[in-house]
Amino acid sequence: MALPIIVKWGGQEYSVTTLSEDDTVLDLKQFLKTLTGVLPERQKLLGLKVKGKPAENDVKLGALKLKPNTKIMMMGTREESLEDVLCPPPDNDDVINDFDIEDEVVEVENREENLLKVSRRVKEYKVEVLNPPREGKKLLVLDVDYTLFDHRSCAETGVELMRPYLHEFLTSAYEDYDIVIWSATNMKWIEAKMKELGVSTNANYKITFMLDSAAMITVHTPRRGLIDVKPLGVIWGKFSEFYSKKNTIMFDDIGRNFLMNPQNGLKIRPFMKAHLNRDKDKELVKLTQYLKEIAKLDDFLELNHKYWERYLSKKQGQ
């Protein structure tokens, strides 16, 4: 059962509507981090008590006997100033200095131990199909953080951090592609983000299913050691009658995520500093056109998505 809560912090009120009585105090703090930028360990939620003592992180919200729309005061400060929060973390070379995967592809993509891990995911990972795959449609796999959503900046609602033209992009893509969301977080937060952005409830398109970090595998690379990647083989193994290397494309801002299937990956420019770039970012407009162009093809393997803008410019100039 949903448990709406209003949290007051920094002179503003934040509405929390995606949690239930089965979620914990820590879940609430994690969600508040996405809204305010205050780390869970820095948060002090006044008034949350059990038997007269402050509620621990593992206490379920239902045990607090809160009435719907209860107002809670939060104390705590962000680690950085707002400008710092708007910037990517300084040690996050996933985005800034994402390594060139081309040198390591051959060693990783076909290594037997990695293929065995993919096979294990195909057998063991449970996919909840939200809408059935459609015959004859191609497959678009989308990352979330920095691809569809600026997850580092602070805002009152997720909509303020949504990448411009997201719904128009998904509406157009849905005409030719089944859409899958794959984020390197847990499913609870993927579902919360999709609800907050209005993706899971939009009437103009449907999400076929969503994958979380449990569908990923760890591979060893000579230069970077162990890294987590998103192997599309998990999807192809589970839905072989619909999807394959020939009809699948994946957008991600981190190139290493398609180390197991480099030819199917398109490295999108990360959407950061939403407050500054919301009016300038046109990435999804151009990618809408690219997806429409390549949807005419029978085999995506003849494409090099690294040069997608060049391909689009050439096609539009004909």
Swiss-Prot record:
A Pfam family reported for this protein in Swiss-Prot or TrEMBL: NIF
FCP1 homology domain span: 133-294
Catalysed reaction, written as an equation: O-phospho-L-seryl-[protein] + H2O = L-seryl-[protein] + phosphate; O-phospho-L-threonyl-[protein] + H2O = L-threonyl-[protein] + phosphate
Entry's EC annotation: 3.1.3.16
Main location per the UniProt record: nucleus
GO molecular function: metal ion binding; proteasome regulatory particle binding; protein serine/threonine phosphatase activity
Superkingdom classification of source: Eukaryota
Residues where N-acetylalanine is found: 2
Modified residues (N6-acetyllysine): 117
Function statement: Dephosphorylates 26S nuclear proteasomes, thereby decreasing their proteolytic activity. Recruited to the 19S regulatory particle of the 26S proteasome through its interaction with 19S component PSMD2/RPN1. Once recruited, dephosphorylates 19S component PSMC2/RPT1 which impairs PSMC2 ATPase activity and disrupts 26S proteasome assembly. Has also been reported to stimulate the proteolytic activity of the 26S proteasome.
Domain notes for this protein: The Ubiquitin-like domain mediates interaction with proteasomes.
Protein name as it appears in the record: Ubiquitin-like domain-containing CTD phosphatase 1
